[in-house]
Amino acid sequence: MNMLTALSVNIALSTCLIAIAFWLPQLNLYTEKANPYECGFDPMSSARLPFSMKFFLVAITFLLFDLEIALLLPLPWAIQTNNINTMMLTAFILVSVLALGLAYEWMQKGLEWTE
């Protein structure tokens, strides 16, 4: 019963705060806030510069591989098994998936900058 009360109070408080933030916004529009900030100076060009699509693809690939490595590192503690063969098999499967993903990116020329 105590947990139900705490849950209902949390939900009611969250709903109340969201409603207040939705219905009472700040309506003061300042021109300084609408402009991009560039070290205190007026911006020389547009704040939305074009970027290389190759860089974007390499950055996304890096983030995906980095996430997979972050999931691989705590694997021995997450499995909580004393059987070293099971742990090594699971780690080998994850490393194999990483290697296959890297090989696929390499074959699709996703890591090439010169093209």
Swiss-Prot record:
Pfam family, one: Oxidored_q4
Main location: mitochondrion
GO biological process, one term: mitochondrial electron transport, NADH to ubiquinone
Localisation per UniProt entry: Mitochondrion inner membrane
Membrane topology: Multi-pass membrane protein
EC number: 7.1.1.2
Cellular-component GO terms for this entry: mitochondrial inner membrane; NADH dehydrogenase complex
Function comment: Core subunit of the mitochondrial membrane respiratory chain NADH dehydrogenase (Complex I) which catalyzes electron transfer from NADH through the respiratory chain, using ubiquinone as an electron acceptor. Essential for the catalytic activity of complex I.
PANTHER family on file: NADH-UBIQUINONE OXIDOREDUCTASE CHAIN 3
Protein name: NADH-ubiquinone oxidoreductase chain 3
Taxonomic source organism: Peromyscus boylii (Brush deermouse)
Gene: MT-ND3
